[in-house]
Amino acid sequence: MKFYKYCASGNDFVITNADRKEDRSALAKELCNRYEGIGADGFIVILPHEKYDFEWEFYNNDGSRAAMCGNGSRAAAHFAHHINKINPNMSFLTGAGIIKAKVNQDKVEVSLGKIKSVQNTFEELGKTWQLCNTGVPHLVHFCQNLDEFDTMLCQKMRQKYNANVNFVKILDENHLKVRTYERGVEDETLACGTGMGACFYLAFLNKKVQNKVKITPKSGEEVGFAYKNEELFFEGKVKYCFEANYNFF
């Protein structure tokens, strides 16, 4: 199987083409294993589609399916344009709906669409939380110090609410810093696109930031977010790492 390794603001992905849908959960888990496989946060399968430029299957590191992945969508768009030679302005089908993307060399902007849902704030485990769905559910906690991030606490919240968990610090009205515990990886990752989107949207909704901001995830790779016409836009660099063949024994 020919595969391509991609990175986007700290998240890494294994991407391949396929001609039909099937359950690839076991394969995803094998490929994403950092000790015995290729190593990645997620596995993306690009499939043909009659109406859109392509359709994808997205698998988390543990083999579970996910409807959406922000950084994964940017990596998929970069792959579709540079490897599959699809037009740089494209749309593709995910489990969370249609994603529109624009590729400009190594920069990719995607529209994450309209926010699916937002719930009221609540108190739990000594912190204030809000739940926001940007294609997948995210718990968000605004803090003064990102050292508050606690993996054990995140595990408890993730298990109870079946959601990703984010800690966010507002540096100023144009800049946020975010740390994310991702379900499916079951640990903190270097970045999470939909998580950063949830943090930005809630900060904007609460009038704490402008409608266009920079966000720095744990990886340090700064990305841009904007909210316009009731849609969430996400832009940043994508890196093609390498391509190779994976042999099954």
Curated annotation (Swiss-Prot):
Organism this protein belongs to: Campylobacter jejuni subsp. jejuni serotype O:2 (strain ATCC 700819 / NCTC 11168)
Cited function: Catalyzes the stereoinversion of LL-2,6-diaminopimelate (L,L-DAP) to meso-diaminopimelate (meso-DAP), a precursor of L-lysine and an essential component of the bacterial peptidoglycan.
SUPFAM superfamilies linked: Diaminopimelate epimerase-like
Family of this protein: Belongs to the diaminopimelate epimerase family.
Catalytic activities: (2S,6S)-2,6-diaminopimelate = meso-2,6-diaminopimelate
GO CC term (a single one): cytosol
Keyword tRNA-binding: no
PANTHER family for the chain: DIAMINOPIMELATE EPIMERASE, DIAMINOPIMELATE EPIMERASE, CHLOROPLASTIC
Protein name in the entry: Diaminopimelate epimerase
Sites annotated Could be important to modulate the pK values of the two catalytic cysteine residues: 138, 182
Assembly behavior: Homodimer.
Sorted UniProt keywords: Amino-acid biosynthesis, Cytoplasm, Isomerase, Lysine biosynthesis
GO biological process: lysine biosynthetic process via diaminopimelate
Pathway assigned to this chain's UniProt record: Amino-acid biosynthesis; L-lysine biosynthesis via DAP pathway; DL-2,6-diaminopimelate from LL-2,6-diaminopimelate: step 1/1
One example GO MF annotation: diaminopimelate epimerase activity
Main location: cytoplasm
Cellular compartment(s): Cytoplasm
Binding-site residues for substrate, renumbered to this chain: 11, 60, 70-71, 164, 182-183, 193-194
Catalytic residue positions: 69, 192
PROSITE patterns listed in its UniProt record: DAP_EPIMERASE
NCBIfam families: DapF (TIGR00652)
